[in-house]
Amino acid sequence: MKGEVSHGRKKYLKWYNKVGYGSGDLAGNVVYAFLSSFVMLYLTNTVGLNPGIIGTLIMVSKLFDGISDMFFGTMIDKTKSKLGKARPWMLYAYIGCAVTLVANFAIPDTLGTTAQYAWFFVAYTLLNAVFFTANNIAYASLVTFCTKNSRERVEMGSWRFIFAFSTSLLIQSVTVQFVRAAGGGAAAWRTVAVVYAVIGLIVNTISVFSIKELPEEELKAGKDHTEEKYGLVEAAKLLFSNKYYLMICATYICQQIYSAMLNMGIYYMIYILKNEDLYSVFSWAINIPVIIAMCITPMLVEKMKGLYRMNLAGYILGTAGRVGVIFAGYMGSVPLMLAFTAVAALGMAPWQGDMGAVVASCSEYTYLTKHKHIDGTMYSCTSFGTKIGGGIGVALCGWLLDASGFVKESAIQPESCLNMLHVMYLWIPMVLSLVITFIMSRMNVEDANEKLRKQLERKEKYEC
């Protein structure tokens, strides 16, 4: 992969490398968007399981995830193969993702209730703690292994999330109708899961072979070439000593709980707005502004002179949008809810496109302060935050539904349940976006790195 030099910056990637990389999140969201948006609905309204028990099982499952995130991140850093460090993990782990995705939506009705809970727990844990972890960390870390150009990293992130949100939009828009067209019931959900798994497997394979990792000597050019050896415990210490890593993890967790609450919108549409087809309309209001923002994120980074200002301004706008959704929701105005939902999504979108570049800066911060390369391990925050946050979010949804007196397979819900749906869909997302805005105000890792580089330069000049 030969680099070009343009405007004093070396370029490592062609346009099709960036697009090919981005398509990998189509495969990732075939798993994640489908699972997070519809598994609770499938389990409660089709299989007939208790949402509170489901939430508890999901929460217990997440106990395995923290260890597996750091484990696979460390394994990626230590991997040497013809495909590179990350691509082998991304390629082969997706086979397991496809199989276990289908298993989550293929719970046999011949099993007893306890066995059905056990089936779900095993399938869900294998998918999240093992296969999706390995695939997702490898995929995220490719941003570091394929280019050293910060603008290209932002562009890769933008393409990634264009595909992610396009896929999420499509799945949220067509799945209910797809299940209905497939005949409804358990068999229909299984058919839909098989179709999505096959599509994901094909696209993931294409993505892996559309991009190449830079040779190790190229990645280490200008840096200390000493062979670095560290175990899982030391890797964990390096991660948790980096305050920006902790901030990114917290942001990811809040984001995923936020997304889980919005994914429960299917219940809000069915029982509050009395029209389940509005779920796809709200998906468009969320995802179309995000896709538009992704296209202009690299330009916005240049215009606003850095990631920090853009991300903070975006989340201030996003929080204001969620406040508007609350007012519109209690007014009962669907058009206003859609408008403010779009404003919120537009404001939060730039972070989705540039977070890969921020994580790369976070990894650089560890190198500048600890003189250790932990690029693959650093990207565990993406998988860790996604799965822990998503797990907490789905579990919380199950617990809140159960506590509210939700009646399975009933067209009419008690007033306590309707009030809880307002809290889940309107209030909790606003509070979470406010928390993320505060974190963003503290996450100026670019400035911290610049100061550290200047300190090192002064030290080197003094020693000379």
Language model features with spans:
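Membrane-embedded alpha-helical bundles of multi-pass transporters/translocases
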Residues: 2-464
